[in-house]
């Protein structure tokens, strides 16, 4: 999937970050926030896998989870690049 389609797919997330999120006090238990994680996951992994990662993250963002630093995992493609460049 092209990067342009991924950017279009994250427009609702950007809308949420800009217009809806500021109306509420910060409550995300993770760094980066769930919305930032979702946007990065979709850009890095595509709409389907990134959306799945974002959904898993949002479901974990609750009082039963400690939270903390939880970055988006690197894609296999990025891992392969790193191995080949060594």
UniProtKB/Swiss-Prot annotation:
Family matches, as SMART domains: Haemolytic (SM01234)
Any one Pfam family match given in the protein's UniProt record, by short name: YidD
Main localization category: membrane
Gene Ontology CC entries for this record: plasma membrane
Location(s) in or outside the cell: Cell inner membrane
Keyword Cell membrane among UniProt keywords: yes
Function summary: Could be involved in insertion of integral membrane proteins into the membrane.
HAMAP family noted in UniProt: UPF0161_YidD
NCBIfam families documented for this protein: membrane protein insertion efficiency factor YidD
Family named by the database record: Belongs to the UPF0161 family.
Record's protein name: Putative membrane protein insertion efficiency factor
UniProt source species: Oleidesulfovibrio alaskensis (strain ATCC BAA-1058 / DSM 17464 / G20) (Desulfovibrio alaskensis)
